[in-house]
Amino acid sequence: MMSRKKRRLWIVIACGIGLSTAVALMLFAFRSSLSFFMSPEQVAARHPPPGRVFRLGGIVQANTVVMGTRNGAPYTTFRITDGRASIPVVYTGVLPGLFRQGQGVVTIGAMAKGDSEFMASTVLAKHGADYMPRDVEMALRKAGKWNPKFGPPPNAGAWDDKSPAQIEASNNG
Amino acid sequence: MSVSRRMLFGLPLLVVGAGGVGFYELLRRMRTGSYNPQAFDNPLVGHDVPDFTLPGVNGRKGFDKPVLAAQKRPVLVNFFASWCVPCAGEAPYLDRLAKAGVDIWGIAYQDKPEAIALYLAKYGNPYARLATDPSGRTAINWGVYGVPESFLIAPGGKVVWHIAAPLVPEIIDDQLRPAMQRLT
Amino acid sequence: MIPTLGNFALALALAIAVAQSVIGIAGPMLRDRLILRTAPALAISQFVMLGLSFLALVWAGVVSDFTVRNVAEYSSSTTPLLYRITGTWGNHDGSILLWCLILSLCGATVGAFGNSIPTSLRSRVLGVLGLISAGFMAFVIAVSNPFARIWPPPLHGAGVNPILQDPGLAVHPPILYTGYVGFSIAFAFAVAALIEGRVDAAWGRWVRPWALVSWLFLTCGICFGSLWSYYTLGWGGYWFWDPVENVALLPWLTGTALIHSAIVVEKREALKTWSVLLAIATFSLSLCGTFLVRSGLLNSVHAFSASPAQGLFILVLLALTIGGSLLLFAFRAPALAASGVFAPVSREGALILNNIFLCIIAAVVFTGTMYPPFLDLLFNRQISVGAPFYDQTVLPLTAPLILAMAVGPMMSWKRAVLLPALTKLWFGAVVALIVFGAFILRGHFVAALGLAGAVWVMIGALIDLAERVRLFRVPLRQSFARLFTIPRAAIGASLGHLGFGIAVLGIAGMSLQVHTIRVLNPGQSIDLGGYNWKLISIAPAKGANYAAREATIEVTRNGHFVEMMHPETRFFTNQKVKTVAAAISTNGVRNLFATFAGDNDSGGGEFRFNIHPLAPEIWLGGLIMALGGAISLTDRRFRVGAPVRNRLRRPSGSATV
């Protein structure tokens, strides 16, 4: 049986080997799989190479969403904008329920060959624990976010007379 | 008991302490707005305002980018609308800011002249200058996706701060004031 | 009225907790027997008060008392009764109150059932628990009080988040929190031992059942959380390496290391420093997790409504708890008696290796989770770390663990020879190699490795059990009888390892999944994975507070009927939110998974179909692990004062426990 000191040395060596393996794996993983986030303006400026996976986030530009089917599978094209540039995105699959025009999304994917479109493999729309969907009623109660999809804003002149129920009725009608 | 062995026992405490300092700093930055993991960063922050020209409303003159960039003092650009209830909520605080000497320029988003006039008559007019963006296209160029939103523009036209929420006192004290102080 | 009483009960509980902490920690120094007996009574009354407070909040939810702001914001009169009750903990303030309740339950349990622990140690343990309780209750009352009132009350509440309106909400948070918070007991034992300046074999024996209970609940909690996201989120994913999931995994990893090293403390009086540090670390990670999730520091799809002010309070609590305990550790731990002697190749050595690897994996997960905010802090760069990072780091690091898991139980204490231990496992090695070869030939490299590893662990666990009952070496009837006389902890350990192997089997199987997305009209069908999926109809349906569109899918295989599946999309009228309810069909070894995304214009709809091989095994494995832990707890050594009957004749030279 070896002395305590020698055994301690073995333990330290084992820890060292384990740690260096872990660090090496991490460095390798960081280099190859960190998905960097780019906005449309950065994409337009930097032209990431086709096939390189990254996250593209921005606002879904209103009136650019086109849905169709390709080989029986549903696909959607739309443009993501950050106000300075807009990138066309193609997504094959089922869009999340929170996806709406004029709202923020994050997509993961890569540029197609020819640098023309962003082929998205995932589309994410976020939500928080207190569900605050961006529709007119909640917008008027909380933070004033208005979704263009729900039609033109109500006339402010008649505003103060309406009760919450009347506002809701006029928005749904 | 060797010194190095004693130090080894203190190592966890040191690591945790460093982490704690880091967390505290992150929290502090969240309060001032310079770190926001949930946000959709407005891409304009740190850049110049985009080119734009907006007409005035109800007899007033609008403004455009050159005029804004030529200002010698910081300008708070506030996107609002008459049909937006929280805008009415932040109106008294904007009034207070204007009276304290802050230059506030307003942009009415997707609104009608009569409605704007009614709104300003009712809630007060804190705006040194007022323009209107009926189509909302300029707002898109600014990265606005709802109202109210406010931007702090430094002299020369660079956007240094942005908030996508009503300017309530906590935000004014925690974020806007430090941002303005950084400019002076 | 009742919410006010609830608030009062909460304040009273805080006062009791403060008293408990003072009396608990200072008591042993005064050597007054009466004072020493007060701490358990205080712990139990603290729990009673918190129980009443919690019940008051639940009552407010049940009767839809909208003067309580928490109820107005997170419940409504149209919410079904089950979710009016369980929605109490479906939001930040209510869930922190649940946290406090469970913390006080831990103290009450130690007070009521810890009679075999020496009085002074128990008193200190209760004192530490009281201190932590007091901190959290102060947080609730000061910054996050669920009993805050609003006037006038709104007519309707905002309603429970639709995604949370699921029986899972009733089950997942309480179980998970019991796991998280339960490790406070092991933590308190560690701190109390450091205060006393003594860690011995008895300490190991007392800590282990409390750590096992917490570990068991945490395993179930994580398992159930994964199952819940699997059937709720509609993508068929079960683990996303989301920061909130990672912060639940971290204490599980160190907790597993703790229950293993507590064994060594108990049997060999070794690894004391390590065990104390692990006990502190596990609860510290639980606390860190609470902090990270509720402060809003981490960007996650599970985001709790957060505020930096609350985050700051919790950070201070963390600094005091973790900093205080580690300071104590730095000063007192070096004085702990030096460990017993053993060779590197021995069961102790294997357990040390196990600890090292579990802790390294925990460190990697922690780094991945904290990398984005700290990179932003130090270098002002925004990045995000996702599943690919963890797949490339954690999965390779589990390989040595899997290999060692089968070998460790074969080794004897103090000094073992490796070759005989490995030879006993020949059967497992052979089957694993066959499985590996079979899947490599089909081109599935990752699945081959995973399945082979899983089989190795599963057979190793069974061989361990077989060795103990001397299967094939004594008459079968005697082996069977031995099953009831060997220590239950041994059965528990085998089951635990078996469960882990089964879970790995499921995870590896999921890597072989197939899926497709299609637009189908009624009458159309597609083929996937040997099954034929046919859309029969789409019709409206209705739930308690939602309207739905329900699709009917007929699944057949080779012409034989398999299942009718009914995926739905649901529209919740109160929040105007649309969710997807997946249809899952299981036969124990594979899952069929169908989601319906919405109608198209021609009477049909968009569908996503998946086949998940071996998916049920993921959660079955987790449950079996927890079952192993539960069986270990029934070991007679953990029961109060039961004499150990020496029924077995001791054979020599073999691995005994």
UniProtKB/Swiss-Prot annotation, chain A:
Pfam families attached to this UniProt entry: CcmE
Membrane-spanning ranges: 9-29
Membrane topology listed for this record: Single-pass type II membrane protein
Residue numbers binding heme: 127, 131
Highest rank taxon of the organism: Bacteria
Region spans: Disordered: 145-173
Keyword Transmembrane helix carried by entry: yes
Gene Ontology cellular component annotations, sorted alphabetically: plasma membrane
Subcellular location: Cell inner membrane
The family this protein is said to belong to: Belongs to the CcmE/CycJ family.
Function: Heme chaperone required for the biogenesis of c-type cytochromes. Transiently binds heme delivered by CcmC and transfers the heme to apo-cytochromes in a process facilitated by CcmF and CcmH.
HAMAP family, sorted: CcmE
Protein name according to UniProt: Cytochrome c-type biogenesis protein CcmE
Source species of the chain: Acidiphilium cryptum (strain JF-5)
Gene: ccmE
